[in-house]
């Protein structure tokens, strides 16, 4: 992926997956419109209520970046680790 060079050069791996949600489900912020945020994530899935992403940041740093860049209050957005279900194929 295009992120491979970034996290290899930093000695880090992608973290996550994380679910990013808004406290108001009708007002999910457009995090991809912000280049600083977009450069730190890889979107796995987006719907009207959440984003599922991998990030080169941990959940706390990613949440702080989103809050700072989009001018949100801490209670307006959440970033939570989640497990992805990947079925086994035989």
What residue spans do the PLM features occupy?
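N-terminal signal-anchor transmembrane alpha helix of single-pass membrane proteins
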Residues: 1-8
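Ordered hydrophobic segments in well-structured contexts
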Residues: 17-21, 50-54, 76-78
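Short, intrinsically disordered low-complexity segments
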Residues: 43-74
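Conserved short beta-strand edge segments in small beta-sheet-based binding/regulatory domains
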Residues: 40-46, 72-90
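Structural motif
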Residues: 21-25, 56, 82
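Short amphipathic alpha-helix segments
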Residues: 15-40
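Short, surface-exposed beta-strand/loop "edge" segments at domain boundaries and coil↔beta transitions
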Residues: 26-32, 59-61, 85-88
